[in-house]
């Protein structure tokens, strides 16, 4: 689900061309707090943390990993991400444009994951939620501060374990 309040703020910031912070999608966050597995084996999904007003505290229920999806230009201080991750702008003949966000979690990442996909309990890398987050750079130190970035979307899904023997590719499309 789109966090309409935060998304509207980021779009307005990007259109103003006077700000670097909150001016576009920067990273994808992953978490394991979006659902509960009941003793019966049934899965209870939580509501998304989205609203129609700007909320700088909106976040995943339990963010455990993040991956940069933005590709920096030569004139920005944005950290370089994985070359297989990117954001593509797809124009249409209609009154909309799509943003296609690709994110690959490769075999060796994240560090500390289980060797095989056989977990029977919730671990840091059994993901059941993800979100897109805006860019944020501390204006005093110049460092990128992902903890201060605005969450732009929040999706909750069936738990999926990321383990060393598995790649996970996410293709996330936002229509504007």
Positions of predicted regions on the chain:
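Small cysteine-rich, disulfide-bonded extracellular modules of the LU/uPAR three-finger superfamily
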Residues: 1-127, 135-176
């Amino acid at each position: 689900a789109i966090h309409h309040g935060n998304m509207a703020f980021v779009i307005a910031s990007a259109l103003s061309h006077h700000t670097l912070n909150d001016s576009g999608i920067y990273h994808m966050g992953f978490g394991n707090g979006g659902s509960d597995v009941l003793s019966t084996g049934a899965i209870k999904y939580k509501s998304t943390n989205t609203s129609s007003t700007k909320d700088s505290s909106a976040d995943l229920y339990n963010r455990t990993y993040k991956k940069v999806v933005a590709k920096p230009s030569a004139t920005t201080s944005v950290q370089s991400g994985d070359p297989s991750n990117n954001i593509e702008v797809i124009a249409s003949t209609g009154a909309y444009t799509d943003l296609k966000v690709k994110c690959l979690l490769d075999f060796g990442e994240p560090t500390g994951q289980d060797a095989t996909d056989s977990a029977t309990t919730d671990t840091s890398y059994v993901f059941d939620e993800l979100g897109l987050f805006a860019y944020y750079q501390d204006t005093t130190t110049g460092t990128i501060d992902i903890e201060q970035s605005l969450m732009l979307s929040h999706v909750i899904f069936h738990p999926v374990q990321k383990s060393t023997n598995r790649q996970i590719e996410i293709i996330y499309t936002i229509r504007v």
